[in-house]
UniProtKB/Swiss-Prot annotation:
Record lineage: Bacteria, Pseudomonadati, Pseudomonadota, Gammaproteobacteria, Enterobacterales
Gene3D superfamilies: Aldolase class I
Family of this protein: Belongs to the ribulose-phosphate 3-epimerase family.
Protein name: Ribulose-phosphate 3-epimerase
Membrane-spanning residues: none
Functional pathway: Carbohydrate degradation
Keyword set includes Metal-binding: yes
Cofactor note: Binds 1 divalent metal cation per subunit. Active with Co(2+), Fe(2+), Mn(2+) and Zn(2+).
């Protein structure tokens, strides 16, 4: 298994002090910044765009930034996020008219590319694009708002995606987003995930390092027989 990565979702941070909160989470031991983009069309919420990402880079954030696009259409905005400093760009297959083309567009703009699957989205979109993926992100809540509870059926879906990744032989991260907490991160990792998005579980606590250390401690107990 790859090294586990913890990716705080800045959707749950204090937007009035976003640079400071993001830097604090990284200093507390996080690996990746998860950046949620919502357009009030594909999902019923409106969040942040490329200018905010560029501001984080200008603030001095050098860690990988994982941009999760919950927008439709997708292709128009991809180059803007790449130019602003995105490291990874993921999108929902339902939001793209041509999934293969969007994946190629992300790569052409110098970013890693990934697909995102909502709780009820079938995995059949993976059938012909595994060779173009760096990340597969499973939503364990319905996208749109932070602070929701983990949907247990995601564990079976994780096992299936882990099997597909292992059989493909490709180097693909398996990421989970939604309701990830200290008390379930071990179970999620055991099902095959190696990258964990956590928003309110980290940012709603006064001590980010304590939460991230507790998550690492749970992950250290996971065995992959």
């Amino acid at each position: 298994m790859k090294q586990y990565l913890i990716a705080p979702s800045i959707l749950s941070a204090d937007f009035a002090r976003l640079g400071e909160d993001t830097a604090k989470a990284l200093a507390a031991g996080a690996d990746v910044v998860h950046f949620d983009v919502m357009d009030n069309h594909y999902v019923p919420n409106l969040t942040i765009g490329p200018m905010v990402l560029k501001s984080l880079r200008n603030y001095g954030i050098t860690a990988p930034i994982d941009v999760h696009l919950m927008v439709k259409p997708v292709d128009r905005i991809v180059p803007d996020f790449a130019a602003a400093g995105a490291s990874i760009i993921t999108f929902h297959p339902e939001a793209s008219e041509h999934v293969d083309r969007t994946l190629q567009l992300i790569k052409e703009n110098g970013c890693k590319a990934g697909l995102v699957f909502n709780p009820a989205t079938p995995l059949s979109y993976l059938d012909y694009v595994m060779d173009k993926l760096d990340v597969i992100l499973l939503m364990s809540v319905n996208p749109g708002f932070g602070g929701q509870s983990f949907i247990p059926q995601t564990l079976d879906k994780l096992r299936e995606v882990r099997r597909r990744i292992d059989e493909s032989g490709f180097d693909i991260r398996l990421e989970v987003d939604g309701g990830v907490k200290v008390n379930n991160i071990g179970e999620i990792a055991a099902a095959g995930a190696d990258m964990f998005v956590a928003g309110s579980a980290i940012f709603d606590q006064p001590d980010y390092k304590k939460v991230i250390d507790e998550m690492r401690s749970e992950l250290a107990k996971v065995s992959h027989e």
